[in-house]
């Protein structure tokens, strides 16, 4: 029915009962089905910082998809065309390569690594989502702590090794624990809140704390 009808930007990407969220570059919109607007992603009884660390980072994540290595190829009307200056595009791709390299270096266990090339768009979106939330929270360390810990809770996972290995092969997202343990150390606020030092396992040197947006 929709084959010759053109792009209908009012058609949803999922059913209301789907627990997920989406960015569609051809429509340049984000979709949040009703089912994701419940705990642990959104809780009406939680405070602002906790909700920002959960659903807030997801909202920021989906918006950032408009500016990842895929979404950046579409203009504001959903047309696939280059709208970047040559210099800006070169800078962006150089930073994206640093993201790939960073995640390629993450060892899950015993020589098993995250694939940074396969997951680059989602990793950029994860970083962008957290950056948005931290900008909103300002210098409030208590609020930052709540947001960090709320963010970690939404990615809590229990899975067998075989399923983990399958995800590493096919999923464009990093493993859930990587979405926490690799993202938070990229932000200076994480070090201030938890008093992280060079001796801690999650320490990343300041010059290696990649930021794109």
Regions found by a protein language model. Name each.
Residues 1-54, 65-213:
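Zinc-dependent metallohydrolase catalytic domains
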Residues 58:
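P-loop NTPase nucleotide-binding module
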